[in-house]
From Swiss-Prot:
Residues 5-233 form the ABC transporter domain. Belongs to the ABC transporter superfamily. InterPro entries: AAA+_ATPase, ABC_transporter-like_ATP-bd, ABC_transporter-like_CS, P-loop_NTPase. GO terms for molecular function: ATP binding; ATP hydrolysis activity. Keywords: ATP-binding, Nucleotide-binding, Transport. ATP binds at residues 37-44. This is Uncharacterized ABC transporter ATP-binding protein YcbN. Gene3D superfamilies: P-loop containing nucleotide triphosphate hydrolases. PANTHER family: ABC TRANSPORTER, ATP-BINDING PROTEIN.
C-alpha cells in the first residue's frame, strides 16, 4: 500500500513531557482522513509537524513519497493547510489576501481566486476588508486559501469552527468534491463526529499523544449494532414488563428515563403493546444504530474495534 502521508514513530517532547508519542499514521491518496481525539490529545501538534510549523523530537515523516524536513520546499508547495485560527491582513479584502498568497506560493493563476471564493460562498463580498468578516467567514476564507493552489494534500484543523449548520453542510459537500472530483487527500480534525461520520473514509483516534487506532469507516459501520431506544418516565415498571412479560433480558438502562433494548428479534409493536397494557407511559421509542460517537467513546474508554 502506498500512502500520501506516513509517519513512523513520530514523537514530540516539550519541556521534558511527551505530547506526541510514537505515532505511526497512514493516509491513502484521495481519501478523507478524520482525525479524532479529546482536547489536548496532540492532534494540532501532529498537524503542525506535518506542515513544518513544529519540528519533531524524533521519528520520521514521509509525504508524497519523500522524507519530510523543514527544507522540503517542493513538498510544502503541494500542501494546503489551515491550522488553528486563520490569520489575514485585516485591512485588505478577501481577494487581496488570496492574491498575496498566490504571490507567496509562486502560483500565477489569478482566475483561481474567484473560483475558490465562489466555492466557499464568499464571492459576493470579495471586495470587503477582512476586518468586517465574522468568525465563520474567516474560516471559509481560510479554507479558500488552503485550496487555492489545488494542492495534493489538505490539512485542516477544526475547519468548520464558527459556521452555522447551513455553512457546515456546504463545506462538507465541498470536501467531498475536493476528494472525489479533484483527487485531493484531506486530513481533517474535528469535534463534530457526526460530520466526520458523513465524509471520512478512514479515521484515526488519538488520546494522550498516542494513536489508539486507525480504522476505515466501513469497518466502523460493520460494527454497528441495531437497537431500540425507549424513553419512559416509568422506567422501573418498563424494565419489569420487558423482562417478565416479553422475556427480553438484553437491555441497558442509560439514565432515569432511557432504556436501550438490544434484542435482535424484538418487535417495536409488541413492546409498545405490552407497555401500554401495563400502564407504562411512552415518551418515545425508536430504532437506532450505534454511531461513530458511540465507537469513539468506547475507544477512548479503552476498547478497540478489533477487541
Amino acid at each position: 500500500m502506498t500512502y500520501i502521508v506516513q509517519t513512523n514513530g513520530l514523537t514530540k517532547t516539550y519541556q521534558g513531557k511527551e505530547v506526541v508519542s510514537n505515532v505511526s499514521m497512514h493516509i491513502k491518496k484521495g481519501e478523507i482522513y478524520g482525525f479524532l481525539g479529546p482536547n489536548g490529545a496532540g492532534k494540532t501538534t501532529i498537524m503542525k509537524m506535518l506542515t513544518s510549523l513544529v519540528k519533531p523530537t524524533s521519528g520520521e515523516i514521509i509525504i508524497l513519497g519523500n522524507k519530510f524536513t523543514h527544507t522540503s520546499y517542493e513538498v510544502l508547495g503541494n500542501i494546503g493547510s489551515m491550522i488553528e485560527y486563520p490569520i489575514f491582513y485585516e485591512n485588505l479584502t478577501a481577494e487581496e489576501n488570496l492574491d498575496l498568497h498566490c504571490e507567496y506560493m509562486g502560483y500565477h493563476n489569478k482566475k483561481a481566486i474567484q473560483e475558490v471564493l465562489d466555492m466557499v460562498n464568499l464571492k459576493q463580498i470579495d471586495k470587503k476588508p477582512v476586518k468586517t468578516f465574522s468568525l465563520g467567514m474567516k474560516q471559509r476564507l481560510g479554507i479558500a486559501r488552503a485550496i487555492l493552489t489545488k494542492p495534493d494534500l489538505l490539512i485542516l484543523d477544526e475547519p468548520v469552527n464558527g459556521l452555522d449548520p447551513l455553512g457546515i453542510k456546504k463545506i462538507r459537500q465541498l470536501f467531498q468534491v475536493l476528494s472525489k472530483e479533484y483527487g485531493m487527500t484531506l486530513l481533517i480534525s474535528s469535534h463534530l463526529l457526526g460530520e466526520i461520520e458523513q465524509i471520512a473514509d478512514t479515521i484515526g483516534v488519538i488520546r494522550d499523544g498516542r494513536l489508539l487506532e486507525e480504522v476505515s469507516m466501513e469497518d466502523v459501520r460493520g460494527q454497528n449494532t441495531e437497537y431500540i431506544e425507549l424513553v419512559t418516565p416509568n422506567q422501573t415498571r418498563a424494565c419489569f414488563v420487558l423482562e417478565k412479560e416479553l422475556q427480553l433480558t438484553n437491555f441497558k438502562i442509560l439514565n432515569e428515563k432511557t432504556i436501550r433494548i438490544y434484542e435482535a428479534e424484538a418487535s417495536q409493536a409488541a413492546i409498545s403493546k405490552a407497555l401500554i397494557l401495563n400502564d407504562v407511559d411512552i415518551e418515545s421509542m425508536n430504532k437506532k444504530y450505534t454511531s461513530l460517537e458511540d465507537y469513539f467513546i468506547k475507544l477512548i474508554n479503552g476498547n478497540s474495534i478489533s477487541a
